[in-house]
């Protein structure tokens, strides 16, 4: 177990272990010459072949400096006039988040451009050309050749270019192009804002890609940083050349970019992080000399932090009142039930969100407002049971014309047993728990969208097969190599399913 911290005071004096190379600025000035005045050849194509009332969804692609075709998701709210735009960068080694997740920004009139990093989990492919091992990740992909051929140098140049792409888009306010991300995404937002001094705001959460020597010394050289351990074991087992490697990696250390940021910054540190060391997160924060505000999250590791998400839209739009439509911790009269509520005047549809694992907040729920739904989210309580869900559903049926229930784990099981009501239009269920005789207890016959998970320890292949056989009115997707987690594909299927109801 890595060290867990209780406050920023314990890490505030953290310093970098490697100095910025003397020729760092010269190196990057040379790299930027490769991307100046190139033909971006920007292309847009409709992403989903159906109409959404409040947002347009596109796949965008452009040519990078070496002929690589870089792919992005582009979302634009259907509003008049120019909009601000967020450059949203994803974590390692994933892909841009689902359209549904990104659409939370568009509910408040913000466009989004989300790049897929080359050679990772999205649509952008890596053309190769780097010299070095590739077995354990991008940190060592190119480490044995010229540093300018390292894959992260190429990704950083793509990051520079995606800002240039954003400036070319119609109806975007060029003065309000901002950047955001967590982990690798935070690192790329730092790089983007450092190379484009005109960027005025960035939001960062537990940045990756920094102080590789300290990461190694603290034994965080696994998971995201596993390439460091692999390289040491197989190419330098006695460690005699490690300092040379760390000196080389300093050219892609985001702490060396952080001092070049002019933007206003909000910065989140996860004090129990087991992937991106809190000490390293703190040392990156110290390098930022522009206007900055720190948020620390005690007890949080490398995970979704909803409280940080809720700071994004008010920060970018400079209006702290923008979450005033979110009503947390509301007690439902006579039911002894507490809920979080996000609602919009005039909505006659409601989405009831039931998740025993995590308490989502306003940023997450804004995507449902886009589709015309108010949201009620049950605050988790170990004493809640099937009767709790049934009573809450009956309460909402008295307030709204249409109800959709989105439920996970045991709440998904409970939902199948809810008393049927014609106002319940659909169920969206993920992570059902195997339960004996559940199919004899099902009361509800509305439309159902269900995801089953191939490596979920709480269910079996036989149970998943019975779901397909026994449930009617079912749209069903099976994800054989997923456990209980967020699935981009299923998120966008939720969006389309809700839009068609």
Q: Residue spans of the language-model regions?
A:
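N-terminal targeting or regulatory segments adjacent to alpha/beta-hydrolase or S9 domains
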Residues: 1-55, 321-326, 371, 399, ...
């Amino acid at each position: 177990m890595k060290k867990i911290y209780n406050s920023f005071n314990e890490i505030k004096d953290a310093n970098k272990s490697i100095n910025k190379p003397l020729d760092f600025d010269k190196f990057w000035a040379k790299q930027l010459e490769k991307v100046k005045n190139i033909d971006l050849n920007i292309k847009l194509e409709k992403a989903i072949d159906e109409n959404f009332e409040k947002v347009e969804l596109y796949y965008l692609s452009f040519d990078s400096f070496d002929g690589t075709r870089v792919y992005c998701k582009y979302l634009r709210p259907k509003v008049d006039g120019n909009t601000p735009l967020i450059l949203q960068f994803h974590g390692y080694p994933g892909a841009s988040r689902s359209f549904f997740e990104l659409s939370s920004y568009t509910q408040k009139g913000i466009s989004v451009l989300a790049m897929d990093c080359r050679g990772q989990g999205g649509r952008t492919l890596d053309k190769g050309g780097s010299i070095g091992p590739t077995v354990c990740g991008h940190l060592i992909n190119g480490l044995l050749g010229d540093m300018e051929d390292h894959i992260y140098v190429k990704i950083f140049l793509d990051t520079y270019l995606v800002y240039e792409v954003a400036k070319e888009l119609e109806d975007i306010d060029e003065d309000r192009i901002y950047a955001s991300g967590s982990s690798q995404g935070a690192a790329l937002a730092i790089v983007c804002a450092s190379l484009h001094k005109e960027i005025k705001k960035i939001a960062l959460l537990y940045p990756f890609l920094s102080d590789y020597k300290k990461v190694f010394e603290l034994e965080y050289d696994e998971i995201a940083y596993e390439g460091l351990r692999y390289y040491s074991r197989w190419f330098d087992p006695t460690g005699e050349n490690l300092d040379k490697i760390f000196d080389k990696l300093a050219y892609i250390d985001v702490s060396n970019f952080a001092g070049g940021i002019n933007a206003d910054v909000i910065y989140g540190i996860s004090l129990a992080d087991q992937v991106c060391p809190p000490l390293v997160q703190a040392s990156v924060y110290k390098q930022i000399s522009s206007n900055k505000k720190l948020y620390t999250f005690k007890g949080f590791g490398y995970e979704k932090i909803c409280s940080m998400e809720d700071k994004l839209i008010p920060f970018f739009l400079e209006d702290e009142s923008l979450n005033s439509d979110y009503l947390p911790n509301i007690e439902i009269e006579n039911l002894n039930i507490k809920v979080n509520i996000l609602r919009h005047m005039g909505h006659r549809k409601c989405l009831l969100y039931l998740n025993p694992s995590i308490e989502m907040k306003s940023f997450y729920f804004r995507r449902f407002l886009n589709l015309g739904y108010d949201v009620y989210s049950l605050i988790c309580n170990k004493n809640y049971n099937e009767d709790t869900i049934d009573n809450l559903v009956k309460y909402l049926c008295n307030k709204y014309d249409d109800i959709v229930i989105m439920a996970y784990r045991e709440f998904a099981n409970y939902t199948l047993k809810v008393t049927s009501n014609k106002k319940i239009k659909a169920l969206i269920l993920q992570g059902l728990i195997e339960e004996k005789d559940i199919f004899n207890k099902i009361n509800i016959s509305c439309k159902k969208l269900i995801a089953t998970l191939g490596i979920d320890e709480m269910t079996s292949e036989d149970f998943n097969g019975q779901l397909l056989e026994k449930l009617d009115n079912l749209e069903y997707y099976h994800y054989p190599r997923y456990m209980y987690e967020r699935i981009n594909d299923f998120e966008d299927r939720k969006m389309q399913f809700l839009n068609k109801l």
